[in-house]
Structure formats: structure tokens, C-alpha cells
Amino acid sequence: MVKAKIAVNGYGTIGKRVADAVQAQDDMEIIGVSKTKPNYEAAVAHQKGYDLFAPASNSGAFEKAGIPLAGTIEEMVEKADLVVDCTPGGIGEANKPMYEKAGVKAIWQGGEDHELAGFSFNAASNYEGALGRDLVRVVSCNTTGLCRVIYPIDRELGVKKVRVTLARRATDPNDIKKGPINAIVPDPIKLPSHHGPDIKSVLPHINITTAALKIPTTLMHLHTVNMEVNTDCTAEDINRIFSSQSRIRFMSQGINSTAEIIELARDMGRPRNDMWENCIWPESITVHEREFYFFQAIHQESIVVPETVDAIRAMMELESDGAKSIQKTNKAIGL
Ligand SMILES: NC(=O)C1=CN([C@@H]2O[C@H](COP(=O)(O)OP(=O)(O)OC[C@H]3O[C@@H](n4cnc5c(N)ncnc54)[C@H](OP(=O)(O)O)[C@@H]3O)[C@@H](O)[C@H]2O)C=CC1
Ligand SMILES: O=C(OP(=O)(O)O)[C@H](O)COP(=O)(O)O
């Protein structure tokens, strides 16, 4: 089988995970990854066997650091069928003309606006809509986690209203530049947070608003989700619907915090402690009339990674059935 040629522009928190997940599939392969700085991440990418590309103006720095380059970012893009842009939020927009000039398909992550790609993706919610598309945005980690729970509930019970409060991890574990250290920060103060409108970019008919707070932790986000539905239901019904979703995992056996979830991922031998699934506490599912609540934790560094693989498969038309793609992606990465 000829594999789809995938480039990762921006080998950071998301990019390095996307590269490994793509490489684990049998219908796509990584032809290159990019960095701007010749630091430890660039050295490890080279050690792993990835061809490394950088802006032409930075090639001297890589040479000085003894990290070999395979070429410039433009040259990497020319070799690819599809580029996954994992540059920091707001940077990826400037790369669109480069992708258009090279005639390659492109995926952006949730730090970019919906309008840049014109299609926002979540595998369970709208896989088929991405079939054959040239430009797609995979929605952000929190938005992905919310789509994964709202879509199946809407399909089975009809969602009337969703209200969510998100406690957002302040920054990623490797990031030493950002805070907060001793504060809780409304993020943003002006409501709603971007997540509600972003859900509507995937599921336009859902009545949803969201509020988010940044808290001094790096491990995971935590959501308090409140949904009103159109159909009578019990906690067992909600439990059954969530159980049918392969990217939802129930937390039990003494797991009462995000710290223990990450320890579970370590104990399971997951790469980089990644927890690709929404982590829901079934005990928290509480129904009153047609309204219910629950808690879920979201591992921000990894949740969008299987979704990105599915987006590639849809855009390259390697699989027309979303459920089959989800199954294939999960199996290859060990989910
Ligand atoms: N981190 C998270 O929790 C999540 C992030 N996202 C989204 O994913 C995207 C990427 O975020 P994240 O992985 O955290 O970002 P990181 O800062 O961890 O990584 C960004 C990468 O892009 C590279 N880079 C920076 N500038 C350029 C450039 N001009 N051209 C090419 N490469 C560049 C950096 O390389 P170098 O260091 O060499 O400069 C780095 O490897 C954003 O849209 C973000 O919103 C989505 C879900 C979760
Ligand atoms: O996609 C994310 O969060 P989001 O879903 O709240 O936008 C990631 O955790 C990145 O968030 P950041 O913009 O705080 O680095």
C-alpha cells in the first residue's frame, strides 16, 4: 500500500505526539518534522529517525549544534501530501500561502480560528464532513473533550442545553515561561470562553455556553458539565451512552484526582504518560428530571492526537467510515 506522506510543521507538545501516532499507522507515514531551534527536542527527533527541517535562516544554528537538517520547511512541505501545522496558536495562519503554493492539504490545531480552514473537526461528530477536504482545523483539547460527550448524548437523547465550567491547567509540564503560580485567573474574564462557540463550529445546533478558569496545575484540565436533554433518562442511560464511546474512560479504583490519572497512564506504560481518552467519574453522573451533571478530566497534551490522525485519514480519503477510522487509529496507538 502506498502510504500518505505527512509532514509535521512544529515539533512541539502536539507535533511530537502527532508524528509518533502517524508513524504507528499502516496507511500514512512521516516524511519530515520541523523545528526553529536546535534544542533537545530537535536532537531527539533526529535520534528517532525523523528527517528534520528548519527555516533557511536558522540552518547555521543547527549546523553549529551538530544536528543535521534534511532541508528547509518549504522543501519539507513540497515533499508532503498533507501538512499538520502544530506551530504555536496564531502562528499557523501565516503558513497558509506556503501550503497553497505547494498544493498540499493542511490541518491546523485549535489555537487557530475556524475561518482559517473553514471546517472544524471532531472524529465522532463530523468525520464524514472532512472527506476529501483540503483544509481542516482539529478543535482544541477542551473542545474535543466536550464534543466527545455532547455528540453521543445529542444523538440518543437530544440535547436541549449545555453549561460547562472548565478549570484549565495553567500551562504544559515542560513550559517554564507561563503562570499562574499563586492565583486563579478567569480565562478569559469576558464570557463565554472560546469553547462554547468552538463546539458550535462542529455541532452548530447545540445550545451551549462555557466559562473557564486557569488554575496553578500543569497535568490536566477538569470540566464540570451540566446538560439538559429532551428525553427522560437515568444515570444508567448516560453511563451506557458514554460506555459505547471508545475514547471515553471511566475513572474508579481509587482515582480521585488528575494526579492519579496521570499515575495510571504511567503505570499503563502509555507513551509520555498520555491519556487520549476523556476521563469521566461515573459516580459524578447525577440526573435530576431531564438535567444531569458530571465531572471529566482532559489530558491537554494528547487528546487531540487520535483526532488529528482521523482527520488525516478523512482528508486523504483513506477510509470513508468514521467509526472504522477511529477503531484503526486506536488500535495502532494502543488505545
Ligand atoms: N499544548 C496543548 O495543551 C494543546 C495545544 N493545542 C494547539 O496545538 C497547537 C500547537 O501547540 P503546542 O504543541 O502546545 O505548541 P508548542 O509551543 O509546544 O510547540 C510549537 C512548535 O512549533 C515550532 N515553531 C514555532 N514557531 C514556528 C514557526 N514559525 N514555524 C515552524 N515551527 C515553529 C516550535 O519549534 P521551536 O521550539 O524550535 O521554535 C515548536 O516545536 C496550537 O494551535 C495549540 O493551541 C491543542 C490542544 C492542546
Ligand atoms: O487547547 C487547549 O486548551 P483550550 O481547549 O482551552 O483552548 C490547550 O490546553 C492549549 O491551551 P493554551 O492556549 O493555554 O496553551
Swiss-Prot record:
Alphabetic keyword roster: Cytoplasm, Glycolysis, NAD, NADP, Oxidoreductase
Recorded GO CC terms: cytoplasm
Subcellular location: Cytoplasm
CDD domains: GAPDH_II_C, GAPDH_II_N
Source domain of life: Archaea
Disulfide bonds: none
One annotated GO molecular function: NADP binding
Family annotation (SMART domains): Gp_dh_N (SM00846)
Positions bound to NAD(+): T13, I14, G111, R169, Q300
Biological pathway: Carbohydrate degradation; glycolysis; pyruvate from D-glyceraldehyde 3-phosphate: step 1/5
Enzyme class: oxidoreductase
BP-aspect Gene Ontology terms: glycolytic process; lysine biosynthetic process via diaminopimelate
Active site (record annotation): C141
EC annotation from Swiss-Prot or TrEMBL: 1.2.1.59
NCBIfam families reported for this sequence: GAPDH-II_archae (TIGR01546), PRK04207.1 (NF003251)
Similarity comment: Belongs to the glyceraldehyde-3-phosphate dehydrogenase family.
Protein name: Glyceraldehyde-3-phosphate dehydrogenase
Organism: Methanosarcina mazei (strain ATCC BAA-159 / DSM 3647 / Goe1 / Go1 / JCM 11833 / OCM 88)
